[in-house]
Amino acid sequence: MSIISTKYLLQDAQTKGYAVPAFNIHNAETIQAILEVCSEMQSPVILAGTPGTFKHIALEEIYALCSAYSNSYDIPLALHLDHHESLEDIRRKVNAGVRSAMIDGSHFPFEENVKLVKSVVDFCHARDCSVEAELGRLGGVEDDMSVDAESAFLTDPQEAKRFVELTGVDSLAVAIGTAHGLYTKCPKIDFQRLAEIREVVDIPLVLHGASDVPDEYVRRTIELGVCKVNVATELKIAFADAVKKWFAENPDGNDPRYYMRVGMDAMKDVVRSKITVCGSYKKLLQPSHC
């Protein structure tokens, strides 16, 4: 098996009306936990790493782990650069073998965002690397970056249409009321806005900030064109809470083979749930389609 571009996964999802889950990874254990479930449920998967992830563990090491696990579990997977902000950073990582990148210029004015995204698209498309961009801006905390509610804004459908036409981007992350992190109250998802975006944009749409969003809301966004669902915070919390509980019950414990497995198993429960919600169960692509 191999590390592939997300475009093959998202094209199939768009055609068949499901979404591919994109799970954020941090180390060997999180990669293994996710792929154990994807193998079990025969689900396509995108493994996403933020710039902070690659500060913690080198890209070359993550790439080697993903490649090895892809072969071990017989799953083609996409290793995705999540929320990267510069062409230079993406260029280096794509040259190292990555075939999926998100360039996040959502903090820039429209024209600057377009210019940045177009430069990344031109570079990546020449190397069979798919590109995701974001228009509108989600609130919350992602990596080390915090966006307060006043700085967040929703995606305008007509701007989205123009943005896609000008950049040639492969998928578009839209701001429709979700936020990075957990919610203090039930999020207000603007389904009408999403439907209007779908009417004028024909590429796969991406839902960021899907942790803690009610399942029925996520399913509705998929019905309205979302083909990729990002999950990060729920995975970290499940892992951490399980490890904390294990140490509370085993105060003299010190063997990582035990407490890491407890964390992995808790994370696996979240992964199973998200695969079910996304409708990606038994949607694994054959290598000939990748």
Curated annotation (Swiss-Prot):
It holds the Pfam family F_bP_aldolase. The keyword Lyase applies. It comes from the Bacteria. HAMAP family: TagBP_aldolase_KbaY. It comes from Citrobacter koseri (strain ATCC BAA-895 / CDC 4225-83 / SGSC4696). It catalyses: D-tagatofuranose 1,6-bisphosphate = D-glyceraldehyde 3-phosphate + dihydroxyacetone phosphate. CDD domains: TBP_aldolase_IIB. GO terms for cellular component: cytosol. Its EC number is 4.1.2.40. Keywords: Lyase, Metal-binding, Zinc. Pathway: Carbohydrate metabolism; D-tagatose 6-phosphate degradation; D-glyceraldehyde 3-phosphate and glycerone phosphate from D-tagatose 6-phosphate: step 2/2. Catalytic subunit of the tagatose-1,6-bisphosphate aldolase KbaYZ, which catalyzes the reversible aldol condensation of dihydroxyacetone phosphate (DHAP or glycerone-phosphate) with glyceraldehyde 3-phosphate (G3P) to produce tagatose 1,6-bisphosphate (TBP). Requires KbaZ subunit for full activity and stability. Its cofactor is Zn(2+). The lineage of its organism: Bacteria, Pseudomonadati, Pseudomonadota, Gammaproteobacteria, Enterobacterales. Disulfide bonds: none annotated. This is D-tagatose-1,6-bisphosphate aldolase subunit KbaY. One of its GO terms (molecular function) is tagatose-bisphosphate aldolase activity. Binds 1 zinc ion per subunit. GO terms for biological process: carbohydrate metabolic process; D-tagatose 6-phosphate catabolic process.
